[in-house]
């Protein structure tokens, strides 16, 4: 995934295979216009299951500028998703009353549902995005079965939800 050079840089050893890597060719799923609208209309935080170094590369490729205090990666907390702690902490740091947390896994939605249950002072909405392993009617049903507030085809549809 990282490619040989980045693997050596980030992991500190030789990669199991010599390859260019996928990380720089991975499709960027969000349009520049969506990024602009989101940054103009909402406080943005990132909660990802990726390691910090990989998340940084992805954010740079999307040209998202998000303060470190508004980012949580797999390196930042032991529990991981769907534990609500990181999302609740982001909500505190963003001083948000309502949180829309979008992701392409069931655990993303579960994280928001769990945070909504655990934190009575805020409202959390988990939004399923059909761009990961879940797609079509089966993906829609799966997200709804774990309590999704909404299910969207693309992260670019988020702007319609938050306006």
Give the predicted meaning of each segment.
Residues 101-150:
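Acidic, Mg2+-coordinating phosphoryl-transfer loop and its flanking beta/alpha structural elements
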């Amino acid at each position: 995934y990282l490619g040989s050079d980045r693997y050596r840089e980030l992991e500190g050893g030789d990669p199991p295979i010599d390859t260019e890597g996928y990380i720089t060719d991975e499709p960027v799923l969000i349009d520049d216009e969506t990024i602009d609208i989101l940054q103009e209309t909402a406080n943005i935080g990132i909660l990802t299951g990726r390691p910090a170094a990989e998340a940084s590369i992805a954010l740079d490729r999307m040209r998202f500028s998000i303060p470190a205090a508004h980012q949580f990666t797999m390196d930042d907390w032991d529990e991981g998703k769907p534990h609500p702690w990181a999302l609740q902490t982001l909500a505190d740091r963003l001083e948000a009353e309502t949180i829309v947390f979008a992701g392409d896994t069931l655990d993303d939605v579960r994280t928001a549902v769990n945070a909504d249950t655990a934190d009575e002072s805020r409202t959390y909405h988990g939004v399923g995005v059909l761009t990961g392993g879940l797609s079509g009617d089966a993906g829609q049903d799966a997200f709804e079965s774990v309590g999704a507030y909404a299910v969207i085809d693309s992260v670019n549809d988020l702007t319609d939800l938050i306006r």
